[in-house]
Amino acid sequence: MAETAPTVELIHVTTGPDGLTVTERLPAPEMTMRPVGQGIPPIWASDPQADVQSWSIWTLPPGWRGGWHRNPSRQWVMPISGRWWVETQDGVRTEMGPGEAHLGDDTNAVPDSTGRVGHDSGVIGDEPLVVMIVQLDDHSPA
């Protein structure tokens, strides 16, 4: 078993000092080797988080596009199947699929000079996008 914790990268849509949205790539919280249950071999895991407000599964049809908007709350978006993209006001377009986690954290975004606010997003390809949405409490550190 590996002696060093694996590196996991997360995609973070947030706001910069000017209130406009930017895309960052951040490391996941630190993981330690720990047991997860009696008789189960230990695994690399981050500390459990107790900041979940709600969760749901969404299915977005091929061709769906959200238009420019803010996230309704701080939320994790985790694709189960299909692919999608997110574009922030800084012009960065990030494509994601299963195995990639995205933290939508642009609830305080302000309009840019063209009136766009927050981010735009859409489904890639001819398959529906199925995502798990985990909405967080407003004051959680994620």
Describe the role of every protein-language-model region.
Residues D90-N108:
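Short acidic-glycine-tyrosine-enriched beta hairpin
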Residues A2-T15:
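Short acidic, Pro/Gly- and aromatic-enriched capping/linker segments at domain boundaries
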Residues E3-P6, Q49, W68, W85:
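Short loop/turn motifs at secondary-structure junctions and domain boundaries
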Residues T15-G67, P128-D137:
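A short glycine-rich, His/Asp/Glu-containing loop-to-beta-strand
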Residues L103-S140:
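A short hydrophobic beta-strand segment most commonly corresponding to one strand
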Residues T59-P61, R70-V86:
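Short, conserved beta-strand element in jelly-roll/cupin
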Residues G66, R83-E87, A101:
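Short beta-strand segments in beta-sandwich/barrel cores
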